[in-house]
Design a protein with these regions (language model features):
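Polytopic transmembrane helical bundles with strong interfacial aromatic enrichment
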Residues: 1-135
């Protein structure tokens, strides 16, 4: 099921995000908290996978959205999910290219938690009232 696959990718993204965060914490200890331009100077592979996989998550979510529209199903869940994903990507871009502006890291984590919650809620709703979004 496509929605379960999307949820699984989100869980993988969480794990990769934790790795990236641990790397950033280490870089802060090494370079100092006043040198955010150095924190991702030489990122680990997990950063690149995390960044690239986010595009796969967007494409998969848009695909699910198109199937939801085609089937005439409730769109509010997938619209919220796509909104969270786009906000996550925008914050990721800000953190990387603008050297971690104030508040972007906690906001990135908060929206990730909202995304996880929305996807999990949608999965539970589907279990209660199943519908088919198979390929």
């Amino acid at each position: 099921m496509l929605i379960v696959g999307s949820f699984a990718l989100t869980l993988i993204q969480f794990g990769l995000g934790v790795d990236v965060r641990q790397f950033i914490d280490y870089q802060i200890k090494q370079a100092g908290s006043n040198a955010p331009q150095l924190w991702l100077d030489r990122p680990e592979i997990s950063f690149y996978v995390h960044r690239s996989l986010s595009l796969v998550v967007v494409v998969l979510s848009i695909w699910i959205y198109k199937l939801v529209i085609k089937e005439g199903l409730a769109q509010k869940y997938i619209q919220f999910i796509i909104g969270c994903i786009l906000a996550e990507i925008a914050l990721g871009i800000l953190m990387y290219y603008v050297d971690f502006p104030w508040g972007t890291q906690p906001l990135h984590l908060l929206i990730a938690a909202l995304l996880f919650s929305a996807q999990l809620y949608w999965l539970f709703r589907i279990k209660i009232k199943p519908y088919d979004l198979s390929i």
